[in-house]
Regions:
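Donor-sugar nucleotide-binding helix/loop cap in glycosyltransferases
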Residues: 1-275
Length: 275
């Protein structure tokens, strides 16, 4: 491990406030450099209602944040830090509630897309699985970009667009077809995106987050994303209680909403997430 002096030297050499040759990184409300990088790394934790912070003020963990933190036990012995997972179910339940509530357009992050991604995903999978034209295997990984780029919470229209995509290209549309639908058709071509981001990076990150809830699982060797039917009670509860949501303009009110524990949802038994 680094000594205190070595650690200080590393930070200073990479701090644009000290080393003027470094351009630095700037986030709104935070000074350029390490403070802004802190916000970049932890902003999602604020958006999900786990921890609230502002520059120059104390960092506050919410109830759900403390619940998530209790997933692990951390020991420090002679400068060595060890971590042990002691309550794995806490992580699943905390992220399940957070993603069930998370609005893409919120006071912390303003986006053109206005929906709750987890709910949109669950609803469109249910519609696809109920369609007699298909085999009930969920949504294709290649179709996930449409969920990510979809501008509203209209799962029926998204389902119909996926049906058309399957009619025209089966389950194997080209990357360029997906790019055209997402960028030109859905977003109207107002912004350019890297092709690899659309068909690989964004879907990988999205699916990884959704799997943290324990509500979805892979099928067909990872080619399809389906509902985890071991969690049908939770899924039905979430769709019944969170599909319709209130919009917030205040960061504090939105954070309070996100961090408030839903006792009924937390009371439902967690099923271990398959690896």
């Amino acid at each position: 491990p680094l000594t205190d002096e070595e650690t200080k030297d590393v930070y200073q050499q990479n701090d644009p406030q000290v080393n003027k040759s470094i351009k630095g990184h700037k986030e709104a409300g935070f000074p350029k450099g390490w403070p802004s990088r802190f916000d970049t790394q932890f902003k999602l934790m604020k958006v999900l209602g786990f921890v609230y912070y502002e520059w120059g003020k104390p960092i506050n963990f919410s109830q759900t944040g403390n619940y998530l933190a209790d997933t692990v036990s951390i020991e420090i012995d002679s400068g060595a830090i060890s971590r042990e997972i002691v309550n794995p179910q806490n992580e699943q339940i905390a992220f399940m509630q957070a993603f069930a509530k998370q609005q893409r357009c919120n006071p912390f992050i303003c986006e053109l897309n206005d929906n709750i991604p987890l709910i949109l995903l669950l609803e469109v999978i249910k519609k696809l699985n109920s369609d007699p034209d298909y085999n009930g295997s969920g949504i294709s990984y290649k179709e996930i970009p449409l969920v990510i780029f979809w501008k509203d919470n209209d799962a029926e229209s998204l389902y119909q667009r996926i049906k058309l995509l399957r009619k025209e290209h089966r389950y194997n549309p080209s990357n360029e077809v997906i790019e055209d639908i997402c960028v030109n058709e859905i977003l109207g071509g107002f912004k350019k995106f890297d092709l690899d981001s659309i068909v690989s990076e964004y879907p990988d990150e999205f699916v990884r987050k959704m799997r943290m809830t324990g509500l979805i699982s892979f099928r067909g060797g990872g080619r399809f994303i389906d509902i985890n039917h071991n969690e049908d009670d939770k899924i039905n509860y979430i769709l019944a209680n969170y599909a319709t949501y209130r919009k917030y303009t205040s960061k504090e009110e939105y954070f309070d909403y996100m961090s408030d524990i839903d006792g009924a949802l937390f009371a439902l038994k967690a099923v271990e997430i398959p690896k």
